Amino acid sequence: MSASPKKVIVGMSGGVDSSVSAWLLQQQGYQVEGLFMKNWEEDDGEEYCTAAADLADAQAVCDKLGIELHTVNFAAEYWDNVFELFLEEYKAGRTPNPDILCNKEIKFKAFLEFAAEDLGADFIATGHYVRRADVDGKSQLLRGLDGNKDQSYFLYTLGHDQIVQSLFPVGELEKPEVRKIAENLDLITAKKKDSTGICFIGERKFREFLGRYLPAQPGKIITVDGDDVGEHQGLMYHTLGQRKGLGIGGTKEGSEEPWYVVDKDVENNILVVAQGHEHPRLMSVGLIAQQLHWVDREPFTGTLRCTVKTRYRQTDIPCTVTALDEERVEVRFDEPVSAVTPGQSAVFYSGEICLGGGIIEQRLPLAAV
């Protein structure tokens, strides 16, 4: 007598990637069910409509594939474990990445636990563009096959024990192939555009949205030479390397080169700007990272040659990583890097393998400044 098929719960977002993931798993012989997560309760009309449309699309796909769709509300977990931390980081003048926190706390913790305990799942699956490889009894996290869509940067906090319970069917495909499959199946999500914006909160006017939760604190904009060139509405609205939205042009005698944010003086509420995107004040020779997560969950000591990304879609930067203590590492780049931003994540790679990463605590500026 053959064993009954393994049960997989697919996180259905109402998008094309999770839709095709569900179908691929059916083809592979799994018993597939879907789960739609509602994680945001602060409903304004616009967001409510978006969530309702996503749920309707997820339901339509599940109906088409003949699978059951469960719904669950993780809004309390999202607020407590993701959103409040997100606001705290902005308040402290740093630029957090909510998608990384959301994957850690919601998709691969709350969802994983709910699927296993309440729905009796053997695995969960998501539409992330990553792959897993099982080596020597541990699961590794690999970049997605489609380099342009690879999302391993957002999943570096996962441990091998979470990866072993997770399946990533579209990680083995290129995005155009995924859309083609959806079109061939006549799925409602086939031509739906990819979502952007904050994880689960969606696409909003960011300044307006943040202003609802954090009071604006206007302050001076000064140049690296100390000249007063304008006023900002709050350091939280600005990030290192930012060019747009500063509201300052070229100076009278000076160059017409665009201005970039090169520093945030949180103590004095001052935004520091300079002209040119490779201004020395914007360049770093390295960084200190904390809150480390290694995929293999082994403590890191000594030094390591690898590559690092300090933001999503960045070209890999060759570097040397040195353990400072259990919680912190120093990263030295082979060449200076622009706009290394505290609060963002530094994610380490060895070839295709995502080793893990940490939060950028501080950047190490170019010594010549």
Swiss-Prot record:
GO terms for biological process: tRNA wobble position uridine thiolation. Its EC number is 2.8.1.13. Disulfide bonds join C102-C199. The active site is at C102 (nucleophile), C199 (cysteine persulfide intermediate). Its main location: cytoplasm. It catalyses: S-sulfanyl-L-cysteinyl-[protein] + uridine(34) in tRNA + AH2 + ATP = 2-thiouridine(34) in tRNA + L-cysteinyl-[protein] + A + AMP + diphosphate + H(+). The record marks H128, Q344 as: Interaction with tRNA. One of its GO terms (cellular component) is cytoplasm. It holds the Pfam family tRNA_Me_trans_M. It comes from the Bacteria. The keyword Cell membrane does not apply. ATP binds at G11, M12, S13, G14, G15, V16, D17, S18, M37, G127. One of its GO terms (molecular function) is tRNA binding. Residues 149-151, 311-312 are annotated as: Interaction with tRNA. Keywords: ATP-binding, Cytoplasm, Disulfide bond, Nucleotide-binding, RNA-binding, Transferase, tRNA processing, tRNA-binding. Residues 97-99 are annotated as: Interaction with target base in tRNA. InterPro entries: MnmA-like, MnmA-like_C, MnmA-like_central, MnmA-like_central_sf, Rossmann-like_a/b/a_fold. It is found in: Cytoplasm. Belongs to the MnmA/TRMU family. Interacts with TusE. Catalyzes the 2-thiolation of uridine at the wobble position (U34) of tRNA(Lys), tRNA(Glu) and tRNA(Gln), leading to the formation of s(2)U34, the first step of tRNA-mnm(5)s(2)U34 synthesis. Sulfur is provided by IscS, via a sulfur-relay system. Binds ATP and its substrate tRNAs. This is tRNA-specific 2-thiouridylase MnmA.
